[in-house]
Every structure is written in C-alpha cells, then in structure tokens.
Amino acid sequence: MVNIVVVGLQWGDEGKGKVVDWLSTNADAVVRFQGGNNAGHTIVINDKVYKLNLLPSSVLQNNKLSIIGNGVVLDPYALVSEIDNLKSSGINITTQNLAISESCPLVLSVHKQADILFEQLRQDTIGTTNKGIGPCYADKISRRAIRVCDLLDTKDLLYSKVNHLLIYHNLLRKSLNTPPIKAEDIVNELLNIAPKILPFVQPVWKTIYNLTQQNKTIIFEGAQGTFLDIDHGTYPFVTSSNTIASQAWVGCGINPSNKSYILGLVKAYTTRVGNGPFFTEQNNDIGKIMFKTGKELGTVSNRKRRCGWFDAVLARQAIMLSGVSGLVMTKLDVLDQFSEIKICVKYKYGDKTYDYLPASPHIQSNLEPIYEILPGWQTSTFGSVSYKDLPQNAILYIKKIEEILKVPIHLISTGPERNSMIILNNDFLQ
C-alpha cells in the first residue's frame, strides 16, 4: 500500500475521519500535520460514536502508530482530556501507539483569551472556535511561542520564555483595558501538565523517516478543508494553517522525495461552519433537508453547518491545488429525497463568468452560481455497499461529477458506519 495524503476539498467536514479510519486498517501509521483542536473528526463503529479533535483517527485501530506532527498547535489540556475520554471507552493510548512532535507550539489559556478579544474587535466576525488556534500560530510565526520541547527546560528558563511571550500579550490586554496575565500562572499550568505529555514526545521527523526507510505505509490526515487554507481559502474567513496536501510534508518533516497518493474528499453537497462566502448556500427548505438528513452540526463547535448544492468550481480548484489523483464522495444518501439536484459549474459576477474562485473578497461576496441541473433518484442509498445497486440517477450524478472534475471517484460513503462504503476502485491502495 502506498502512502496516502487525505485532504478535504471543500470547507472541512467532508468525512475525513471515517475515511482515514477505514484506510488505516491497512496502514502502519497515521500523521496529523496541521491545525489543532479546532478541527473535529467523527467516527462511528458498531453504533458507537467517537469524536476526535487532536488525535489521529488511527487511535481507534489496534497496532497503529498515531503521530502528531510539528504543524499542529497542541492544546495540552485538550489532548489529555481526549486521551482520558478514549481510555474510559476502552481505547488505550500508550507511548507505543502515540508520538508527539517536540516542535509543536503549545496552545495556552492566554491564546484562548486573545482569540475572544480579537473576535470582539473585528467589524465582521470570522466565526472562530475560540480555541486559541490563530493566536498560537501568530506567536509561532513571531518566534515567541512556547513549544513542547520547552517543557523539558528548567523552571527558570521556562519562566523566562513565558515572560517573553507575555510582553506582547499583556501589551495587547492593556490596550483593551484587560488585566494582565502573570507568568507564574502560565508556568504552573505547564509544569502541571508536562508529566502527562512528555512521555509521548519524540523527534517525529526522525520517526517518520525511519518508517519510510522500512517501507511502512503512512497516511497523512488533513484537518479542515482547502477553502479554509490561510493562503488559498476564502480569506479572511479562513483558518490559520495551510490545509492543502503540500502541508503534509512541512507539517511533519517528511521530505518531498517520498511520493504519496493524494486522495481528496468531497461531500455530495457542500457545507460550511461559521461566517464567510458560500456560493451555493440554500437558505430554504432544501438547505433544511440537507441539514436534518446529514445531521450537520459541527463536531467541535456544535454550531449548525450551512448547507448547499455541490460546488464543482471549488472542488476543481482544490484538486489542482493539491494534485489530487482520486476522490472519495461522502454522504451521497443525503441527496436521496430530492427530485432534482444542482451542480455549480461556474460563477457569475456582473457580465463576467469565472471557472475559478477569484481571490478578491469583494468579488467573492457578489458571485452568483451557474448551475447544471440533474434528475434526482428519490430512492434510499443509505448503507449501500454496491455500486451497481445504486439508482441510475445516482450513478448519473456520480459520473457527471467525475466528468466535470476530470478525476475518478474511488470510494463512496453512504452512511456513518465504518463499512458503509462503496468501493469503485481500490487500485490506489496497492
């Protein structure tokens, strides 16, 4: 089995957790390479629901190494809580099946408070999860972040680093008439949590290098989706990390000569959590049906996901950005009720049409979708595992999307359970 990079091609919530869990059955290791606990993956096994935020989806499999790469910003308390929750469900997390990069920046309480303060200052709120992700990445770029490796320092050295961090944050807080944070409080938080984190810490880049030298199979698990990418997304309504496939190499330290198969995920329709442009959004009964049938609530925020028709313009651009070779379509069954189904094939702005997403926020806010309309099938596909047994109009829809995107669909998910999967082509697994 080749190494596989799994990325979302929309605004996240494409079902990456389920697919990575399914793929990891035949893999040796799974790596998270960006984001933090602002991303959520939901996996259903034998009717039991597991919700993961920081841990790779492979933790639910036996004898798999789960790796948190340097591109992840790590909330140590959230991680320990997640580990404890899994242990209470009978999933044992040990130093044999979890590795954490020593270079991960740590999300601290000061970052979560800064997140809330910044959001209050904005004229147009982004819709952040208030998990402190953006401020932590900002500290990383500004070279003042506290990293996992700093937990190995003496108390005095750690205090010095925290004090340096708080020079910036307390200046910000002072300008907003907010009380300062004491370095002692942050240091004590870190010293309390360090013993629970440090046993898992190692030079992850070296661990991954050794795995590649042994021809082990690695899956790189993306979080969020292409159009939340800090550079390529619907800026400023984006996350604070790069979410496209190339981040997999940077976010864990694997060198680019290790070629991987890029597997892109799309829902059969489109959803988005939080604010920002959404070109095919359905603020009507159609959107309500998608929301209810798809159970579209954010795993982390529990916010309602906005719902709309499949946007082939976005998907096609995401395929180009990540070099996607094959697709997984999820939640096909959510479309079962509709008599007709629309696919956005272009955008219109004034008298101009676009076959890509312009970068300008002003233009984005005024784009109108141009649709191609297909007949619905109004027959249940829920839980289907056979392509030939799908309704003909469902097959027509699948083939139309392949035709527009010029990339084959390998897998189709028809329900939340691990094995609710139609396999069209598994050659990419060889």
UniProtKB/Swiss-Prot annotation:
GO molecular function terms listed in the Swiss-Prot or TrEMBL record: adenylosuccinate synthase activity; GTP binding; magnesium ion binding
Example GO biological process: IMP metabolic process
Catalytic reaction equation(s): IMP + L-aspartate + GTP = N(6)-(1,2-dicarboxyethyl)-AMP + GDP + phosphate + 2 H(+)
Annotated positions binding substrate: T299, V300, S301, N302, R303, K304, R305
Any one GO CC term of the record: cytoplasm
Binding residues annotated for Mg(2+), in chain numbering: D13, G40
EC number(s) per entry: 6.3.4.4
Top-rank taxon: Bacteria
SUPFAM superfamilies from the UniProt entry: P-loop containing nucleoside triphosphate hydrolases (SSF52540)
Binding site for GTP: 12-18, 40-42, 305, 331-333, 413-415
Residues engaged in binding IMP: D13, E14, G15, K16, N38, A39, G40, H41, T129, R143, Q224, T239, R303
Pathway membership, UniProt: Purine metabolism; AMP biosynthesis via de novo pathway; AMP from IMP: step 1/2
Location in or out of the cell: Cytoplasm
Keyword set, alphabetical order: Cytoplasm, GTP-binding, Ligase, Magnesium, Metal-binding, Nucleotide-binding, Purine biosynthesis
Cofactors, names only: Mg(2+)
Cofactor note: Binds 1 Mg(2+) ion per subunit.
Residues annotated as the enzyme's active site: D13 (proton acceptor), H41 (proton donor)
Subunit relationships: Homodimer.
Purpose of the protein: Plays an important role in the de novo pathway of purine nucleotide biosynthesis. Catalyzes the first committed step in the biosynthesis of AMP from IMP.
Family from the record: Belongs to the adenylosuccinate synthetase family.
Protein name: Adenylosuccinate synthetase
